[in-house]
Amino acid sequence: MKCAFCGNPDTQVIDSRVSEDGSSIRRRRRCPACDKRFTTFETADVRMPQVVKTAGHRSEFDIEKVRTSFLRALHKRPVSTTLVDEAIDRICHKLLQLGEREVSSRQIGEMVMNELARLDKVAYVRFASVYRSFQDISEFTDAIKEIQKSSH
């Protein structure tokens, strides 16, 4: 690694330690040219997949869009923000576990619906009505039957 002080391309690692949580490595380095010491940290570069929209264009995964979807569906419902944050964390974890560079917006929508079904049945129906573009009452009753069936 290049020296942070003089730019020398060769430095020596004096000490390496794993962080307490195991997520990074701290390295103490010395430059043989200028004899200065500095610390570097090595962490895994984990990125969320790109979202492929239904129209075919791609965009960066935006956790705030997911949070907004939850908050709209859960508006005036008795669900704590802690539970919402945990649900969002589960979605992010699932997306990372997929190990894919791209994921469809449909997959994310289904993940949101699954989490809402766990959190609040009314919020699930609210979200489903917009997400699936319900056109009449029968689609609402179908969604209600679906959620009732899954909770038994």
UniProtKB/Swiss-Prot annotation:
Origin species: Chromobacterium violaceum (strain ATCC 12472 / DSM 30191 / JCM 1249 / CCUG 213 / NBRC 12614 / NCIMB 9131 / NCTC 9757 / MK)
Sequence similarity: Belongs to the NrdR family.
InterPro entries for the chain: ATP-cone_dom (IPR005144), NrdR-like_N (IPR055173), RNR_NrdR-like (IPR003796)
Signal peptide (residue range): none
Identification of the protein by name: Transcriptional repressor NrdR
Cofactor(s) this protein requires: Zn(2+)
Gene from which this protein is expressed: nrdR
Single annotated GO MF: ATP binding
Superkingdom, taxonomy of origin: Bacteria
Stretches annotated zinc finger (unnamed): 3-34
